[in-house]
C-alpha cells in the first residue's frame, strides 16, 4: 500500500471515531480522514484524490444513492463503500446500480471492514497504474508516429504515411469508444 487516502463519512460521531481508529491502527499506510456529512464532503471529494470512500448510507441532507452518483460523476473509478444499518435488498440494488463498490451491514466485523477497504484501495492503486501505463504508451506511440512521419517525409512517401495515420487514428477512436 502506498499512503492512500481513505475518507470515512458518518454523522454518528462515536461510530465515525471507531471506524477511523480501527483503520488508522490496522492500515498504517493509509491516511484516514473523517467527515460528519456526506453532502459537505462532496466538495472535498472533488478536490482531493481518495483511494476509497466509506460512507454511512443513512445521511441527512443527501440519500446514499444520489451521493454515490455524485461521487461517480466526479471520479468514475473511485470505490464508494456504503454502510447499511440493516439489510435492504432494494437499497443495495439501487446503490450497486448507481456504482457503489461494496455494501457492508452494521455492525461490520473488523476483518470484513479491513478486507473491503484494503480491496478498494488496491483497486484504486491498480487503476492508477493502468492510467499511467496508458499515458506512457500513448506518448510512446505518438513519438513513434512522429518518427515515422519524418521518415516517410524524407523518402517522399507522405501520402502513404497519411493513409497509415488515418487508419491508426480510426482504430484508436474505435478502441476508446468501447
Q: Locations of the language-model features?
A:
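Acidic, metal-coordinating helix/loop segments flanking the phosphotransfer/catalytic sites
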Residues: 34-52, 62
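C-terminal output helix
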Residues: 90, 108-117
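Two-component/phosphorelay signaling modules centered on CheY-like receiver
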Residues: 13-33
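Receiver (REC) domain switch/output surface
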Residues: 26, 113-125
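Short amphipathic alpha-helix used as the core "switch/output" element in two-component signaling
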Residues: 43, 65-77
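C-terminal output/effector regions of signal-responsive regulators
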Residues: 135-178
Amino acid at each position: 500500500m502506498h499512503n492512500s487516502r481513505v475518507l470515512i463519512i458518518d454523522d454518528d460521531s462515536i461510530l465515525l471515531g471507531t471506524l477511523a481508529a480501527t483503520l488508522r491502527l490496522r492500515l498504517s499506510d493509509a491516511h484516514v480522514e473523517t467527515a460528519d456529512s456526506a453532502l459537505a464532503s462532496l466538495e472535498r471529494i472533488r478536490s482531493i484524490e481518495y483511494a476509497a470512500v466509506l460512507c454511512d448510507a443513512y445521511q441527512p441532507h443527501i440519500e446514499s444513492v444520489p451521493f454515490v452518483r455524485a461521487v461517480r460523476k466526479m471520479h468514475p473509478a473511485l470505490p464508494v463503500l456504503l454502510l447499511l444499518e440493516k439489510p435492504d435488498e432494494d437499497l443495495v440494488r439501487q446503490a450497486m446500480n448507481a456504482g457503489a463498490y461494496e455494501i457492508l451491514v452494521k455492525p461490520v466485523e473488523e476483518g470484513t471492514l479491513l478486507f473491503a477497504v484494503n480491496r478498494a484501495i488496491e483497486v484504486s492503486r491498480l487503476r492508477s497504474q493502468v492510467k499511467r501505463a496508458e499515458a506512457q504508451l500513448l506518448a510512446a506511440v505518438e513519438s513513434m508516429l512522429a518518427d515515422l512521419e519524418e521518415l516517410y517525409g524524407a523518402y517522399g512517401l507522405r501520402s502513404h504515411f497519411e493513409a497509415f495515420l488515418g487508419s491508426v487514428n480510426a482504430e484508436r477512436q474505435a478502441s476508446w469508444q468501447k
